[in-house]
Amino acid sequence: MTLFVMDISPLQQSFGLRCKELRSESGFSQEQFANRIDMDRSYYASIEVGRRNVSLSNLCKIANGFDMTIAALMTGVTEKTD
């Protein structure tokens, strides 16, 4: 039986790029955003360049820092509100 093994590197890189774009659009430096989400700047920087496999708790911190849901952070789709 062969198990499907996914190379997470492209996913990590894509997620990091999304974080970098959102942070830049929000006008934060890496240091400012890392402070906002209570994360070390160098650790956050390594997420942006795709060197970190982000834990669920850090995923929550990042989504909260951008004032969005995890789903919106991961897909780029925001929920409509009335």
What residue ranges belong to the model's regions?
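Alpha-helical residues within the helix-turn-helix
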Residues: S24, N35, N64
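Short, charged recognition helix plus adjacent turn
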Residues: M1-F4, N64, M74-D82
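Short alpha-helical DNA-recognition segment
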Residues: G27-V49
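A short, Lys/Arg-rich alpha-helix, primarily the initiator
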Residues: T2-S24
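DNA major-groove recognition helix of helix-turn-helix/homeodomain DNA-binding modules
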Residues: S57-A72
